[in-house]
């Protein structure tokens, strides 16, 4: 059975694609990140990371540890560049007072005119955004 975050991400992507003609979307990609912090701290880190990455939050449900958001493209980005890619994300935070797990489901959405470049350009942008979010969730040890 699909997870709640997968269903919400699919509905959000469908709304984006159905409400806006001329868009293409990449596949949904799921990932899990262990966080060496309490569930509440992991949720705060997730929100901070999403704010830093300029995500517009669509759903914020802290009682269930669920966040859904979209990072919209830059208004002045050139067609064919990563700045024209949307990143759609759904995050579920689970854990206890000592450790947490953040399950993330992401996909890219791009203008139809980028259909030839989007699988490479936008997927790289999606991966880069997720890498930066993971650094906020579980920072490397201080040297």
Label each region the model flagged:
Residues 16-19:
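C-terminal motif of bacterial Sec signal peptides marking the signal peptidase cleavage site
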Residues 1-9:
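Bacterial N-terminal signal peptides that target proteins for export
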Residues 21-143:
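Ser/Thr-rich, low-complexity intrinsically disordered terminal regions
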Residues 13:
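Soluble catalytic regions of membrane-associated enzymes that act on cell-envelope
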